[in-house]
């Protein structure tokens, strides 16, 4: 198991009458982190997954009694895949307001979906954390600084999703990356309602892959893909919100 820097921060963030929202890409280790948190807490805890219909329906009820039955006599309620719950922000607000002696954690992979649903109702009621693939510091802490430095090229080429880091065989790493891209990263985008040309996002990613670390022209991207600049900007925003890309703004002293 790779020790994650975020674990002690989550432990200290658990406060009665408050919520914690944990965002991160799929397969980055959020559920594993939550399980480690469970193993290290003395609080009576209920862990539920919104992948299960019965929990999804209860969490979407906006009914104090239904939500109270879900919490029962637990001191900490953890909701995994919370973005799948309709009006999750409002229902979390009800939980936080109506059950001030309990603490709550909600995790989600599609940050845009979860953020839009939780930010306004939970203003002042939550702490927000972002979980990313394993950092070089975490690798060094787990495997030792010498091994981390020796394997630096490997991390740079293959990336540092936890399963990729722990897999020793290159063919298996390649298979895992293919599944990760096809089954998880694209899914959040391609299942979006109103996304009229999902194939254009895939084409956009291919173009961006050749420009990593370089200045990117939205006008050139729009011309290459035969779509307007506003659509390119929207697609880039979506890609950033589901953790596929990270935009680095140009440096300027004239702020």
Question: What does each model-found stretch correspond to?
Answer:
Residues 1-14:
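Pre-Walker A adenine-sensing motif
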Residues 14, 170-255:
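Accessory nucleic acid-recognition modules appended to NTPase machines
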Residues 22:
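Hydrophobic anchor at the beta1->P-loop junction of P-loop NTPases
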Residues 112-128, 143:
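Short regulatory helix/loop adjacent to the ATP-binding pocket of P-loop NTPases
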Residues 30:
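Conserved lysine of the Walker
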Residues 33, 37:
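Hydrophobic positions on the alpha1 helix immediately C-terminal to the Walker A/P-loop
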Residues 45-76:
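Short glycine-rich substrate-engagement loop in P-loop NTPases that contacts/grips substrate
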Residues 89-112, 119-121:
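Conserved catalytic/switch belt of AAA+ P-loop NTPases
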């Amino acid at each position: 198991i790779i020790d994650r820097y975020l674990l002690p921060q989550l432990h200290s963030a658990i406060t009665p009458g408050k919520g914690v929202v944990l965002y991160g890409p799929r397969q980055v280790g959020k559920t594993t982190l939550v399980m480690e948190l469970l193993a290290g807490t003395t609080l009576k805890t209920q862990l539920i997954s919104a992948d299960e219909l019965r929990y999804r329906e209860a969490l979407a009820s906006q009914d104090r009694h239904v939500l109270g039955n879900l919490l029962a006599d637990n001191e900490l309620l953890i909701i995994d895949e919370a973005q799948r719950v309709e009006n999750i922000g409002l229902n979390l607000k009800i939980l936080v307001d109506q059950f001030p002696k309990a603490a709550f954690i909600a995790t989600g992979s599609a940050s845009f979906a979860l953020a839009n649903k939780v930010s306004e109702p939970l203003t002042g009621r939550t702490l927000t954390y972002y979980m990313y693939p394993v950092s070089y510091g975490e690798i060094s802490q787990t495997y030792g600084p010498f091994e981390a430095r020796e394997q630096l090229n490997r991390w740079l080429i293959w990336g540092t999703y936890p399963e990729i880091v722990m897999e020793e065989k290159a063919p298996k790493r390649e298979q895992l990356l293919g599944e990760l891209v096809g089954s998880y990263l694209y899914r959040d985008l391609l299942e979006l309602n109103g996304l009229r040309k999902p194939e254009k996002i895939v084409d956009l990613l291919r173009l961006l892959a050749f420009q990593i670390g370089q200045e990117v022209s939205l006008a050139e991207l729009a011309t290459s893909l035969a779509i307007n600049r506003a659509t390119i900007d929207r697609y880039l925003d979506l890609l950033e919100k589901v953790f596929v890309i990270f935009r680095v703004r140009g440096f300027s002293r004239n702020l």
